[in-house]
A protein has these predicted regions:
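Short, amphipathic alpha-helical "lid/cap" segments that border enzyme active or binding sites
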Residues: 13, 121-124
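Phosphate-binding site of ATP-dependent enzymes
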Residues: 41-122
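Active-site nucleotide/adenylate-binding loops and adjacent lid/helix of ATP-dependent enzymes
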Residues: 1-63, 67-69
Length: 124
Protein backbone atom coordinates (compact mmCIF):
# COMPACT_ATOMS: atom_id res chain seq x y z
CA UNK A 1 0.00 0.00 0.00
CA UNK A 2 1.29 3.41 -0.97
CA UNK A 3 1.03 6.82 0.73
CA UNK A 4 2.36 10.29 -0.10
CA UNK A 5 3.47 12.95 2.35
CA UNK A 6 0.43 15.16 2.96
CA UNK A 7 -2.13 12.34 2.60
CA UNK A 8 -4.56 11.64 5.43
CA UNK A 9 -2.50 9.28 7.62
CA UNK A 10 -5.40 8.31 9.85
CA UNK A 11 -7.44 7.13 6.85
CA UNK A 12 -4.38 5.41 5.38
CA UNK A 13 -3.68 3.62 8.67
CA UNK A 14 -7.28 2.41 8.83
CA UNK A 15 -7.02 1.13 5.25
CA UNK A 16 -3.80 -0.75 6.06
CA UNK A 17 -5.30 -2.24 9.23
CA UNK A 18 -8.35 -3.52 7.34
CA UNK A 19 -6.42 -4.93 4.35
CA UNK A 20 -3.18 -6.37 5.75
CA UNK A 21 -2.30 -8.68 8.63
CA UNK A 22 0.28 -7.57 11.17
CA UNK A 23 3.21 -7.44 11.31
CA UNK A 24 3.75 -5.14 8.35
CA UNK A 25 6.83 -3.32 7.14
CA UNK A 26 6.77 0.42 6.53
CA UNK A 27 9.42 1.55 4.05
CA UNK A 28 10.37 4.73 2.22
CA UNK A 29 10.26 4.23 -1.55
CA UNK A 30 13.60 6.00 -1.94
CA UNK A 31 16.99 5.13 -0.52
CA UNK A 32 18.22 1.79 0.70
CA UNK A 33 20.15 0.00 3.44
CA UNK A 34 16.94 -0.20 5.50
CA UNK A 35 17.00 3.52 6.34
CA UNK A 36 13.54 4.54 7.52
CA UNK A 37 12.21 0.96 7.71
CA UNK A 38 10.05 -0.11 10.64
CA UNK A 39 8.46 -3.46 11.49
CA UNK A 40 5.01 -2.63 12.84
CA UNK A 41 3.15 -5.17 14.97
CA UNK A 42 0.14 -3.08 16.00
CA UNK A 43 -2.06 -0.66 14.02
CA UNK A 44 -1.52 2.03 16.66
CA UNK A 45 2.16 2.21 15.58
CA UNK A 46 1.46 2.88 11.89
CA UNK A 47 1.30 6.67 11.81
CA UNK A 48 4.56 7.03 13.74
CA UNK A 49 6.28 4.52 11.45
CA UNK A 50 5.02 6.28 8.30
CA UNK A 51 6.26 9.64 9.59
CA UNK A 52 9.64 8.05 10.36
CA UNK A 53 9.82 6.74 6.77
CA UNK A 54 8.89 10.18 5.40
CA UNK A 55 12.23 11.43 6.77
CA UNK A 56 13.81 9.49 3.86
CA UNK A 57 11.47 10.67 1.10
CA UNK A 58 8.00 11.88 0.10
CA UNK A 59 6.44 8.46 -0.53
CA UNK A 60 6.12 5.34 1.60
CA UNK A 61 4.94 1.77 1.06
CA UNK A 62 3.52 -0.64 3.59
CA UNK A 63 4.02 -4.33 2.87
CA UNK A 64 2.67 -7.48 4.44
CA UNK A 65 5.26 -9.09 6.70
CA UNK A 66 6.12 -12.69 5.91
CA UNK A 67 8.01 -15.22 7.97
CA UNK A 68 10.58 -17.59 6.63
CA UNK A 69 14.15 -17.67 5.48
CA UNK A 70 15.88 -14.58 4.04
CA UNK A 71 17.24 -15.50 0.60
CA UNK A 72 18.80 -13.19 -1.95
CA UNK A 73 20.31 -13.52 -5.40
CA UNK A 74 22.33 -10.87 -7.20
CA UNK A 75 21.95 -10.51 -10.95
CA UNK A 76 23.69 -8.46 -13.61
CA UNK A 77 23.54 -8.07 -17.37
CA UNK A 78 26.45 -8.55 -19.74
CA UNK A 79 26.79 -9.11 -23.48
CA UNK A 80 25.41 -12.66 -23.08
CA UNK A 81 22.31 -11.52 -21.17
CA UNK A 82 21.24 -11.71 -17.55
CA UNK A 83 23.67 -13.54 -15.28
CA UNK A 84 22.93 -14.62 -11.71
CA UNK A 85 25.22 -15.32 -8.81
CA UNK A 86 24.61 -18.11 -6.28
CA UNK A 87 21.62 -17.75 -3.96
CA UNK A 88 22.66 -16.56 -0.49
CA UNK A 89 20.84 -17.14 2.78
CA UNK A 90 21.06 -14.25 5.23
CA UNK A 91 20.80 -15.19 8.89
CA UNK A 92 20.21 -12.30 11.26
CA UNK A 93 20.47 -12.08 15.03
CA UNK A 94 17.87 -9.28 14.95
CA UNK A 95 14.11 -9.40 14.54
CA UNK A 96 14.60 -8.77 10.81
CA UNK A 97 17.45 -7.89 8.42
CA UNK A 98 17.67 -4.21 9.39
CA UNK A 99 20.47 -1.64 9.12
CA UNK A 100 22.08 -2.86 12.33
CA UNK A 101 22.14 -6.47 11.12
CA UNK A 102 23.50 -5.44 7.71
CA UNK A 103 26.31 -3.15 8.82
CA UNK A 104 27.13 -3.85 12.47
CA UNK A 105 27.91 -7.54 12.35
CA UNK A 106 24.57 -8.91 13.49
CA UNK A 107 24.08 -11.24 10.54
CA UNK A 108 25.88 -13.97 8.65
CA UNK A 109 25.57 -15.38 5.16
CA UNK A 110 25.53 -18.91 3.82
CA UNK A 111 26.70 -19.06 0.21
CA UNK A 112 25.50 -20.94 -1.58
CA UNK A 113 22.29 -21.24 0.40
CA UNK A 114 21.51 -24.74 1.60
CA UNK A 115 18.35 -25.16 -0.46
CA UNK A 116 17.25 -27.67 -3.12
CA UNK A 117 18.49 -26.98 -6.65
CA UNK A 118 14.88 -26.58 -7.79
CA UNK A 119 14.35 -23.78 -5.27
CA UNK A 120 17.58 -22.08 -6.29
CA UNK A 121 16.52 -22.25 -9.95
CA UNK A 122 13.15 -20.67 -9.12
CA UNK A 123 14.85 -17.80 -7.29
CA UNK A 124 17.27 -17.21 -10.14
Amino acid sequence: MFVRKGDDLKAFSEKVASNLRFPVFVKPTQGGSSFGVTRVTDPSQLEEAVNYAFAEGPTVIVEQGVSGRELTCAAYMDAQGIQTLPVIEVITENEYFDYDAKYNGHSSEVCPAEIPDETSDLIK
